[in-house]
Design a protein with these regions (language model features):
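ADP-ribose/NAD+-binding catalytic cleft of ART/PARP-like enzymes
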Residues: 1-135, 142-144
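Polar low-complexity intrinsically disordered regions
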Residues: 1, 231-232
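Catalytic toxin/effector domains delivered as secreted proteins or via bacterial secretion systems
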Residues: 80, 84-230
Length: 232
């Protein structure tokens, strides 16, 4: 018979009636990966029934599947450790704490690394989250480079893919602040983020951005590095 620790890492763990796949948490978190977490049946599709921990199943359709391919959800922490580290309290009403300086990485003097840039017509950017926010990223940035919490991968209000993932095209030039993302939520960050001066919602209303349909951003070449586009 295989050793117990092998069984625990190879078998889904039934917790609160959920199959917690062994690759979600480190093996040391088993056999009770959801200890100290209060299960909320309203969020039965979230890991351990806690919306802060994100969906049980990550999006499997392109392009989000590409952006999450390297994602290690909790940075080596168990569920309770992750929430205590990044929310400071296991109380379900306590949400995450976010980094200072709008989430930009800091230089050696502790100042945010950012510069004002102009987004030109035709540029595509994307976002995990509602249009009420002010952060976007270059199209196709990996999830780990964005330093976002697992909750941003949950479906939005409709519950349908890709409801909480949005792609936008610039229709009129406008400016924002571009810089590297600070490491946070157990992720390395260091991807590029753009902090907008107005919310995405306001830019949509003002005609500066247009949200693209799924069939308008499904070209694989837009999500990979190709130094010689169009050449074999």
């Amino acid at each position: 018979m295989p050793p117990l620790d092998i069984l625990l890492t190879e078998q889904p763990n039934l917790t609160y009636g959920q199959n917690i796949e062994p690759d979600i948490f480190p093996r040391r978190c088993f056999p009770d990966p959801c200890k100290h977490i209060k299960f909320n049946p309203e969020y039965a599709d979230s890991v351990c029934g806690d919306p802060r921990l994100g969906p049980l199943t990550l999006p499997s359709r392109f392009p989000v599947s590409v952006e999450t391919a390297t994602y290690y959800r909790y940075g080596g922490l168990c569920a309770d450790e992750f929430i205590l580290r990044w929310a400071g309290d296991l109380d379900p009403k306590k949400w995450f704490n976010y980094p200072d300086f709008d989430g930009f990485a800091l230089d050696s003097q502790g100042k945010p690394i950012k510069a004002e840039v102009t987004l030109t017509v035709g540029r595509k950017v994307d976002r995990f989250g509602s249009p009420k926010g002010k952060f976007v990223a270059p199209l196709g940035s990996s999830y780990i480079s964005r330093s976002l919490p697992p909750s941003n991968l949950a479906p939005g209000k409709t519950g349908n893919y890709p409801d909480n993932y949005h792609v936008y095209m610039v229709l009129k030039p406008f400016s924002g602040f571009l810089g590297p993302v600070a490491s946070w939520f157990g992720q390395p960050g260091l991807g590029s983020q753009i902090h907008l001066k107005s919310s995405v919602e306001e830019l949509l209303t003002g005609g500066f951005l247009r949200e693209l349909r799924e069939d308008e951003y499904d070209e694989p070449s837009e999500y990979s590095y190709d130094p010689n586009p169009g050449k074999a």
